[in-house]
């Protein structure tokens, strides 16, 4: 594929989970931004098993006769990245843009992403300026970004921002990957030849709360560690070797001290011995837990169950007809 291949159609993929308050504004603003494009466009909204009225709102929007919206309804909640992959499976554009439904990243940035992608980039990432999140979220995001950069060698500054643009061949490459734990920005960068980042505005969340709770962030960190690299397993081997060497040295030292100071001294060191023993046992359990994480992910991948199940797609044929009329 030529690096400067023209973009004839843009697909916007937006995962939605319990966002009924923000959906009307999201649809209006995204549609208005897309109308500024010179290319044809489609807006794919993926309902990730919402329990509020999001499903009904998406269905109504996709059934609008003048709409460019496709609604993909999943049968339950599978997670943000699985929902985006479901959207990727439906896209027909040459450039695919992902966007969160909470409106913290403005849809009005869409034309900028398209313009930058036309310069020949495979992936256009974004960095949130003046980020409007809690200190906890900012700190957690900073730690995750540093970990990703060290593991991948890609020095992109904000992997947590989902407002990103991907060329179609990058999306097709990602669709050929069937692992269960998928972090799309990282996966895309493994296939991209040319990447760049632009700074975008970041607004406060107007409706509801973030879907990433503390436990979800911890699970995300485990996912990233185990799906990115096998470095933790290598570190375990090094730590295990160091502990074994330390244990051997400590044993020799205890024997020497017993010979020098007699059996009375050895009795006084029982608590020290137990403390060191518990430290070694604790390290072993940590290692076993990490190894179990890897084995569990291998087990999930070997079962080859689908990432998601699409219950219904609304508006696909209608969107194609609207594109033909505009041509």
Curated annotation (Swiss-Prot):
Its EC number is 2.4.2.53. Its main location: membrane. CDD domains: DPM1_like_bac (cd04187). This is Undecaprenyl-phosphate 4-deoxy-4-formamido-L-arabinose transferase. Pathway: Glycolipid biosynthesis; 4-amino-4-deoxy-alpha-L-arabinose undecaprenyl phosphate biosynthesis; 4-amino-4-deoxy-alpha-L-arabinose undecaprenyl phosphate from UDP-4-deoxy-4-formamido-beta-L-arabinose and undecaprenyl phosphate: step 1/2; Bacterial outer membrane biogenesis; lipopolysaccharide biosynthesis. The keyword Glycosyltransferase applies. Keywords: Antibiotic resistance, Cell inner membrane, Cell membrane, Glycosyltransferase, Lipid A biosynthesis, Lipid biosynthesis, Lipid metabolism, Lipopolysaccharide biosynthesis, Membrane, Transferase, Transmembrane, Transmembrane helix. It catalyses: UDP-4-deoxy-4-formamido-beta-L-arabinose + di-trans,octa-cis-undecaprenyl phosphate = 4-deoxy-4-formamido-alpha-L-arabinopyranosyl di-trans,octa-cis-undecaprenyl phosphate + UDP. SUPFAM superfamilies: Nucleotide-diphospho-sugar transferases. It is found in: Cell inner membrane. The chain crosses the membrane at residues 235-255, 270-290. The lineage of its organism: Bacteria, Pseudomonadati, Pseudomonadota, Gammaproteobacteria, Enterobacterales. GO terms for biological process: 4-amino-4-deoxy-alpha-L-arabinopyranosyl undecaprenyl phosphate biosynthetic process; lipid A biosynthetic process; lipopolysaccharide biosynthetic process; response to antibiotic. Gene3D superfamilies: Spore Coat Polysaccharide Biosynthesis Protein SpsA, Chain A (3.90.550.10). It is a multi-pass membrane protein. InterPro entries: ArnC_tfrase (IPR022857), Glyco_trans_2-like (IPR001173), Glycosyltransferase_2 (IPR050256), Nucleotide-diphossugar_trans (IPR029044). Pfam families: Glycos_transf_2. Belongs to the glycosyltransferase 2 family. The keyword tRNA-binding does not apply. It is an enzyme of class 2 (transferase). It comes from the Bacteria. One of its GO terms (molecular function) is phosphotransferase activity, for other substituted phosphate groups. Catalyzes the transfer of 4-deoxy-4-formamido-L-arabinose from UDP to undecaprenyl phosphate. The modified arabinose is attached to lipid A and is required for resistance to polymyxin and cationic antimicrobial peptides. GO terms for cellular component: plasma membrane.
């Amino acid at each position: 594929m030529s690096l400067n291949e023209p973009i004839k159609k843009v697909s916007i993929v937006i995962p939605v989970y319990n966002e009924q308050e923000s959906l009307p504004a999201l649809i209006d603003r995204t549609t208005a931004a897309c109308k500024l494009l010179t290319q044809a466009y489609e807006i794919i909204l993926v309902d990730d098993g919402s329990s509020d009225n999001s499903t009904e709102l998406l269905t109504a929007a996709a059934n609008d006769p003048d709409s460019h919206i496709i609604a993909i309804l999943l049968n339950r909640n599978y997670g943000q990245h699985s929902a985006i992959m479901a959207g990727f499976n439906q896209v027909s554009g040459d450039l695919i843009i992902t966007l969160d439904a909470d409106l913290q990243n403005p849809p009005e940035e869409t034309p900028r992403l398209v313009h930058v992608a036309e310069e020949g980039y495979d992936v256009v990432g974004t960095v949130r300026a003046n980020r409007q999140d809690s200190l906890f979220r900012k700190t957690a995001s900073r730690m995750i970004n540093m970990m990703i950069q060290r593991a991948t060698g890609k020095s992109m500054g904000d992997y947590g921002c989902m407002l990103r643009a991907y060329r179609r061949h990058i999306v097709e490459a990602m669709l050929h990957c069937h692992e269960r734990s998928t972090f799309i920005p990282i996966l895309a960068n493994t296939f991209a030849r040319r990447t760049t980042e632009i700074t975008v505005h970041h607004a406060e969340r107007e409706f509801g709360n973030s879907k990433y709770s503390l436990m979800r962030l911890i699970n995300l960190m485990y996912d990233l560690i185990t799906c990115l690299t096998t470095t933790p397993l290598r570190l375990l081997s090094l730590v295990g070797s160091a502990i074994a060497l330390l244990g051997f040295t400590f044993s020799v030292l205890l024997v020497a001290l017993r010979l020098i100071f007699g059996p009375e001294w050895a009795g006084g060191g029982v608590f020290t011995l137990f403390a060191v023993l518990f430290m070694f046992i604790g390290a072993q359990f940590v290692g076993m837990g990490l190894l179990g994480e890897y084995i569990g992910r291998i087990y999930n991948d070997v079962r080859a169950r689908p990432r998601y199940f699409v219950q219904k797609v609304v508006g696909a044929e209608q969107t194609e007809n609207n594109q033909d009329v505009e041509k």
